[in-house]
Swiss-Prot record:
Record note on quaternary structure: Forms a robust complex with the archaeosine synthase beta subunit RaSEA, likely an alpha(2)beta(2) heterotetrameric structure. Formation of this complex highly increases lysine transfer activity.
This protein's pathway: tRNA modification; archaeosine-tRNA biosynthesis
Protein family according to the UniProt entry: Belongs to the archaeosine synthase type 1 family.
Enzyme class: lyase
Gene: arcS
Keyword GTP-binding: no
Protein name: Archaeosine synthase subunit alpha
UniProt source species: Thermoplasma acidophilum (strain ATCC 25905 / DSM 1728 / JCM 9062 / NBRC 15155 / AMRC-C165)
Amino acid sequence: MIEDQALFGYARYGKVDDVVYPSVIASGNGINYGDSDIEILGDRIPRQILYPAKIKQEILETDKLVIIPNGAELVRKPKDLVRIIMDIHSRYGFSKLIMISGISDPYSIPALVYLGISFFDSSILEMEGKMGYRFTPFGIEKADHDVSSENAIFISDMMHIIQRSISDGTLRELIEKAVISSKAAEMVRIADYSYYQDFESVFPVRTPYIKANTIEDLYRPDLIRYRNYISESYVKPDADIALILPCSAKKPYSRSKSHQKVIGALGNLRRFIHEVIVTSPIGIVPRDLEETYPARFYDIPVIGLWYEDEKIMMKRMMSSYMGRNRYRKVIAFIPEDLDFITEAIPYPHEVIEFKSSNLQRLREVIQREIAGGKAVNQKVAKYNSILRYQFGEWILPLVSGYTIRRNYNQDMIVKDGKILFVYNENLGKFTINKASADMFIKNGKFLVEIDDFKPTSNVYAMGVVDATEDIRQEDEVVLVHSGEVRGVGIAKMPARAMIELKKGIAVKVR
């Protein structure tokens, strides 16, 4: 039986028949070669079907696997290969593991695992080693002797790293660091550009961090998800003056030296303005969302220069944002390298160069503009924004009139004497309390329907009956049975995986 220990999007780490995946399986370890057939994880397949001279069918199916034959040929056609893989996901979901045969390029394996491949056969990789092609971290080098045993160690080490990256949520960073194979890079780009909706539906709502070292990070599913939210759904607080600021290396931005200078110079005037930070690869970060994912959890090389793709992204996002969120006045306190962003501001604005000597001028301009303006409770505005961002617009009317109580160094959202949510400052998110669970049940949001049992530390996939489509891995969820609240916790799988799998942790119960 398939037993997933961890998921990252379509990538899976676990065991089937005591064979760990993802892995490269060799003779005697999950795969056995006969004269006329091959046994893979207990299922027999004719050799001529697995290694055809000419591809007559795109996939083969066994009890546990969907097999893509002749991978060596398909890797040279990344668009076709990605299409086949995505068709398999659409048809089989998480019910079967995917194997690809005949891969000769070990450097394509991390990307293929990201796309959802769990097994590779070692036949052609072994042949490469026997011919003296040595695999190294920097590419292939030619030796004058058999290096297949060295290559086996290299591949084993690589697979352990991939397995660990799935488990700790850093697989996307790994595949971006391991860009040796141009075909692998092409496959990831195709997945990002052409299959965003598919990957977004299974991509975690948060990862431990984002190392945004390449332009490819612009197209990560989680970052596109965030940018779409800001462009299409975000609602600003009531302040009608916007202050545009640059990002900082330290996160959240408000703790950086540069932003602390601005905060100190403006003092109480900040209650009358809305601060908006411009950055890449995230685009726009309202101050009220700076503690959330991804804004607090990314790192980018700061060199004072922007790629053209980054400029286009930021300008489009600013234009869309400003089109939906109207301000009476926009003040841009930015360095020269961000001047291009003002082209996307559709109404009156004033630009002040971002430097310490201009802080007094900035204060004077804001003092002049806020005359008669309305002060905003910044903490309430922040928590309203985070609640809306995390759960959706529907939640705000249900918590309207709440108070904020601080206990055990945590802020709590309280209404009618009941603690509804607890704010986790380190993660920039709210945790659901049982007192608010009925809100989710009545609105059909973030629900995992389970069998009739009382959950303890974990709910396994076998105990899941159904799950709402809005659930992504790492989402806060409510556990329910026949309309009765049974608990709350954190999703460890996307909704579809919870429903289709029989093994593995679906929800970590709090």
